[in-house]
Amino acid sequence: MTVKIAQKKVLPVIGRAAALCGSCYPCSCM
C-alpha cells in the first residue's frame, strides 16, 4: 500500500466531514 492510495481513500471522507462541519474541517473538526 502506498501513501497515494491511502490519500485517495481518505480524501472523500474529509470532503464529507467538511460538508458536515460547514466547509471548514481544520478549524471545526480538528
Curated annotation (Swiss-Prot):
Cu(2+) binds at residues 21, 27. Disulfide bonds join 24-29. Keywords: Copper, Copper transport, Cytoplasm, Disulfide bond, Ion transport, Metal-binding, Oxidoreductase, Peroxidase, Secreted, Transport. Its main location: secreted. Residues 1-19 form a propeptide. There is a cross-link at residues 20-21 (2-(3-methylbutanoyl)-5-hydroxyoxazole-4-carbothionic acid (Leu-Cys)). GO terms for cellular component: cytoplasm; extracellular region. InterPro entries: Methanobactin_OB3b. It catalyses: 2 superoxide + 2 H(+) = H2O2 + O2. Induction: By low copper concentrations. Chalkophore involved in scavenging, uptake and suppression of toxicity of copper. Each apo-methanobactin (apo-mb) complexes 1 Cu(2+) or Cu(1+) ion to form Cu(1+)-mb (Cu-mb) which is then taken up by the cell. Enhances growth rate in the presence of copper and reduces growth lag upon exposition to elevated levels of copper. Cu-mb contributes to the switchover from soluble methane monooxygenase (sMMO) to the membrane-bound particulate MMO (pMMO) by inducing transcription of pMMO subunit A. It also stimulates the enzymatic activity of pMMO. Monomer. In the absence of copper, may exist as a dimer or an oligomer. This is Methanobactin mb-OB3b. It comes from Methylosinus trichosporium. The lineage of its organism: Bacteria, Pseudomonadati, Pseudomonadota, Alphaproteobacteria, Hyphomicrobiales. The gene is mbnA.
